[in-house]
Amino acid sequence: MSDDMVLHFSSNSSNQSDHSLPDKIAKLEARLTGKTPSSAKPPQQQQQQQQQVSLWSSASAAVKVVTSTPPGLSETSISDSDDENTGDFLIRANTKKRQKVQESNNFSVVDHVEPQEAAYDGRKNDAESKTGLDVSKKKQGRGRASSTGRGRGSKTNNDVTKSQFVVAPVSAASQLDASDQKDFRPDGQLRNGECSLQDEDLKSLRAKIAMLEEELRKSRQDSSEYHHLVRNLENEVKDLKDQEQQGKQKTTKVISDLLISVSKTERQEARTKVRNESLRLGSVGVLRTGTIIAETWEDGQMLKDLNAQLRQLLETKEAIERQRKLLKKRQNGDKNDGTDTESGAQEEDIIPDEVYKSRLTSIKREEEAVLRERERYTLEKGLLMREMKRIRDEDGSRFNHFPVLNSRYALLNLLGKGGFSEVYKAYDLVDHRYVACKLHGLNAQWSEEKKQSYIRHANRECEIHKSLVHHHIVRLWDKFHIDMHTFCTVLEYCSGKDLDAVLKATSNLPEKEARIIIVQIVQGLVYLNKKSQKIIHYDLKPGNVLFDEFGVAKVTDFGLSKIVEDNVGSQGMELTSQGAGTYWYLPPECFELNKTPMISSKVDVWSVGVLFYQMLFGKRPFGHDQSQERILREDTIIKAKKVEFPVTRPAISNEAKDLIRRCLTYNQEDRPDVLTMAQDPYLAYSKK
């Protein structure tokens, strides 16, 4: 058996450099056979053994395989069995196991065996314990009903068991050699391998470091260039922004200067025109009566000339009438004398009478023309007085020096002045458009309570107005404070006149023109009454209806507006500001004194009726020639239970009159609200 194993080991060996290998093999054979190393062998076997030793490359795997003894079998029994069966069986290498070991680990042969017995015995015991475990596993996993031997010929059960005990130690020893391969490797070779690997790794790392350092250097260089470029760009952007800012400032300054120059020219032209018109139409003078000084109007040359023409026409008319009377008296005297008159005499009497009639007709036409001129004079006088008042208010305003408010709005000329506010035409230097700046001022002599009340009132107006976006309602763009006593609201600018100026220039409007204006006003009111919180304007009058450059009517001034809460019933809301508003355009319920008035959108419906009536007939339906104090004192509106229509040329349609009657219904319960009025067929336009 030992000879066959020697042959098996020699076939797997590739190392021939170890000359002490025969002694080691002799010791191993002695252990396997239970004999001493000095036991003699046949010369033929020794010669074969020496020949095979020179071809060995590794003995560690063979040592581990041979030294492993299966549990339950002694060395003597194994050697005996081998001696008994060496003639019949030949021990061969497990080629399958060998292929697995070579494919998985590709083990190398150990060059020398540890000479110390203690270390050798320890490795032997470890191998035996591992071999026992492997044998038990193979017995459980590889048991079959019948098996065939790996040698030549058939084997008995004892032979199969023996072959299993021989093969199993080889596998276990191979595993042990794989796990302890590093233990049998020479320290020098291990250090040389590790050093070579470390040198290669070090070279690779140094190459990588050099490459990374080069990349870092390039990145830093690029970063420096980029930073330099960024700084240059930032400086350029800063310079451009500075230039742009300077350009904007220069542009704003140029625009502001041009606007101021134009406004100054307009102011001078307006004052020159007023002076010239004052000579023609009249001027305001001062009348002193004792200690009372009052302003009075002094008529101009135009009215004096018109009055002179009227007097002359009247005198001529009276003279002609006297001549006609004398002619008739002479004709009547001739008839009483009974004298016959010839036909020629009759013609002489008839012709003068026809001349007198013709002349009287001509005088009447001239008189009507002069009266029309006087009416036009009255309208021009009203416009002149309004312009004179505007100029006087502008001269007395503390904002008449063309300031720029909020670094944005350049004030130009005064448009008008109310009780506690001034409205200036201004230019928005940011959005580049004309706007109207309404300056709200607090009287320094007011009490703090009154100031707070006015501020709340103005803030409420702004809140209401800013939420309104409709093409028939003037927009509110902005709001800001000027000082402790003044703030400004910026409104949409309407370059056209207001309805009050239109009615002053023309006593009455054609029905077609008046109708389209009322339709636009009603559309704005419908918008106010379709919001989640309905709004009552409460101060509709000609001065609060503006026209833009295209003639579109827009409602403005929501200073007295009322917000109708959701919980208000059909009766409306309480009027808490009784006495405010313009009395000619307010309904009777606003003048009730015995109880708190209840109002609704029907207040605006009454105002629409008054506006429509005034546009068609040239005067208000109730209290036209009365002051507000007289209206309040004489209860003019409370007594206005029926509306009367004057005769006009051309005549007003019945549909227009019916709409006015419905709007001026005395009882609030019977009067339509805004949404109902808007459904009136007269206010609907349809394509023909």
UniProtKB/Swiss-Prot annotation:
State if Oxidoreductase is listed as a keyword.
no
SMART domains reported in the protein's UniProt record:
S_TKc
Where are stretches of biased composition, namely Polar residues? 155-164
- Which stretches does UniProt call biased (Low complexity)? 10-19, 35-70
Q: Where is the Protein kinase domain?
A: 409-683
Annotated catalysed reactions: L-seryl-[protein] + ATP = O-phospho-L-seryl-[protein] + ADP + H(+); L-threonyl-[protein] + ATP = O-phospho-L-threonyl-[protein] + ADP + H(+)
Q: What class of enzyme is it?
A: transferase
InterPro entries per record: Kinase-like_dom_sf (IPR011009), Prot_kinase_dom (IPR000719), Protein_kinase_ATP_BS (IPR017441), Ser/Thr_kinase_AS (IPR008271)
Q: Name one GO biological process term.
A: regulation of post-transcriptional gene silencing by regulatory ncRNA
Read off the Pfam families from this record: Pkinase
Task: List the ranges annotated as motif Nuclear localization signal.
Answer: 97-100, 123-139, 389-392
MF terms from GO for this chain are: ATP binding; identical protein binding; protein serine kinase activity; protein serine/threonine kinase activity
* Residues that bind ATP: 415-423, 438
Q: CDD domains, alphabetically?
A: STKc_TLK (cd13990)
Q: Which domain of life is it from?
A: Eukaryota
* A GO cellular component annotation in the UniProt record: cytoplasm
The Swiss-Prot or TrEMBL record lists the needed cofactor(s) as:
Mg(2+); Mn(2+)
Return the annotated region ranges for Disordered.
1-196, 326-348
* EC number(s) on file: 2.7.11.1
Q: Give the family this protein belongs to, as stated in its UniProt record.
A: Belongs to the protein kinase superfamily. Ser/Thr protein kinase family.
Name of the protein this chain belongs to: Serine/threonine-protein kinase TOUSLED
Taxonomic classification, please?
Eukaryota, Viridiplantae, Streptophyta, Embryophyta, Tracheophyta
